[in-house]
Amino acid sequence: MTGCTRRLPLIALLLGIAFAVPAQAEEAYDPWPGLVQNIFSSRPMNDGGNVIGIEMPYRAEDAAIVPVTLRSKLSPGDARRIRSITLVIDRNPAPMAAKFELGPDANVTEISTRVRVNNYTDVHAVAELSDGQLYVSKVYVKASGGCSAPAGKNAEEAQNRLGQMRYRQFAREEAPASRMREAQIMIGHPNNSGLQMDQVTQLYIPAFFINQLKLTQDDSPVLSMEGGISISEDPNLRFTYVSNGARRFRAEAKDTDGHVFRNEWDVEKPGT
């Protein structure tokens, strides 16, 4: 009996090591080189410290709605512009969260949205400039379970709000004559990830999400998004851009079931 008692701590230690080694191996594995190959066809990556900024909380309060802000850091005198920004959440089931194409004349300098984060992970922002070069910045986020977290609304409520859009403009500190604008688009949509479970049937809810969004001022492109399952429920984009004097702001969204949602709004002049 004494021999068995003595062996128990040793067995516990060995079991602890057995379970710890796979966890440590997973932690040590860096998926980023493979993602560069798969998403960017192994194109060279330059340090984006002076080109593209990414801001996220180090420890997320809610892994299903983690705020992220992407910001241009190009100097005003730089003749180049950011053509697109790809957001990659390295350890998510579908790492490419979104790709944003920026209108050539819109001068979009900042984009904020909300994403799901499934594991402790690096998150990369890759900017492609008008000269064809890629620049990358990253942050580390502590969050888990965001892709499988239950929806915030029940299925009936989500269906009733499907495709409903809201547009907001925000006052800025620039002089009234400034053409810089700040706006927000919100779309009612469950954006199901395919990893969430129906609490009644205990079956997985099929993936169903906004995969395309186009924003224009009159007919001039401001911003478009190719989205995936990592974009949170009820997609929400807040962004800055330069007005071309358009009177109408338009949005068109498509989802993976083929629905098309459109809306447009009057553009308020600064100070009104």
Write out the residue ranges for each language-model feature.
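N-terminal edge beta-strand
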Residues: 36-63, 157-180
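Surface-exposed, short loops/turns at beta-strand junctions within beta-sandwich domains
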Residues: 114-120, 240-246
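Low-complexity, Pro/Ser/Thr- and charge-rich linker/hinge segments at domain boundaries
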Residues: 28, 144-167, 270-272
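Short acidic/polar inter-strand loop motif in beta-rich domains
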Residues: 129-136, 254-263
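Short edge beta-strand/loop segments characteristic of extracellular beta-sandwich folds
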Residues: 55, 67-76, 182-188, 198-203
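Aromatic sugar-binding surface patches on proteins
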Residues: 103-111, 229-238
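Beta-strand signatures of extracellular beta-sandwich domains
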Residues: 84-88, 212-216, 252
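Bacterial N-terminal signal peptides
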Residues: 9-18
